[in-house]
């Protein structure tokens, strides 16, 4: 099923008993985090806080708190269907030339569908039903959460930041947390390699000293939100991909104060600029690692205009030690990653990002090994093929007889098929998540690869052990008489 906007998604979830309206007053300061955290851990519903303490705007939380709701948001009825989305992205990332006329005709509908999903620009949009400008702008109207006791202040978490570099044809969508530091000021915490930061850097080089236009959409439709966190090929815009997920074109509207285009059905839009050189210390905040991050300096976004729907809904989340909402997103998107990796490395049989590993810091890969050194090639490929795995610190590679999603299996493979010195790959001075305080230098650290595969001649001089396998005939015989044995 496809959802036109966030309200349509809320209605659909409610019909499935996947959303609960909370009428009891709950504060966005710490209390909503506690309620959402308990609900997520219980695999409970999305929550619509209709009476946030001190505010008139409802807060939507725990929206993507189960993999099933992530799948629904991407237009799928089951998590398993996300593999098909991954296959489409794999095809778009590395399209193969047609093998003949028949093959060309078979692929034509895919390209036609992609072309037909180009965003549609509209003149009038519900996200601009109410316009607040100038001195009337006050972010204090929004029920922005303060999530943890040690947080320095309220934090916008689910904003889709829209930017456009001076040398690019299309806009970039990114989700960056934003610390509220005044009635019209937030700190834009984007890392140097992210799209928004790259657009800003190019702008400063081409237009030194000039304000950089930025817009932030809050409460977009689920396909657009999830499109911003999916590994979309550079040749495809997030808006077009959202159209593919939704089954109809993404409607955009030009902002009132700049040329950026934002989702027309979003709940709230923040428009403004970043003045080059205006920086502020951000944090500390509790984050997805389960720790408070260190304070660092980032650009300040000045909000010049707020537009919103009549009676808007504020979409929010929290991040903390897994499981949290980003970890659940990671579990679902894991299914999208598998076909993309298999397109490049057909020998891969499964790929798993354990959510307890902060969603991306550890990966387990199973493969059909074909030659000595093959496992090392695959682990190096994981680190380099998709930028989403740039910060993956540990890659474990095992044979395809191991269940990548079963720690009992994985640990058995590590302890029986590895020699620590021979089968461990260490790489120094690689990009590491800025939030990873365990690295010796901020943003720079090491990576470890573990080859837990059977070793081939050339990798070992010893005879390799044979796995114990039960006799199938005996197993069937005991199955047949098991109840007669009287063993509970």
Swiss-Prot record:
Primary residence: membrane
Catalytic activity annotation: a 4-hydroxy-3-(all-trans-polyprenyl)benzoate + H(+) = a 2-(all-trans-polyprenyl)phenol + CO2
Cofactors: prenylated FMN; Mn(2+)
EC code: 4.1.1.98
Superkingdom of the organism of origin: Bacteria
Positions annotated to bind prenylated FMN: 175-177, 189-191, 194-195
InterPro entries: UbiD (IPR002830), UbiD-like_C (IPR049381), UbiD-like_N (IPR049383), UbiD_bacteria (IPR023677), UbiD_Rift_dom (IPR048304)
A GO molecular-function annotation: 3-octaprenyl-4-hydroxybenzoate carboxy-lyase activity
Details of cofactor binding: Binds 1 prenylated FMN per subunit.
Annotated Gene3D superfamilies: Single helix bin (1.20.5.570), UbiD C-terminal domain-like (3.40.1670.10)
Protein name: 3-octaprenyl-4-hydroxybenzoate carboxy-lyase
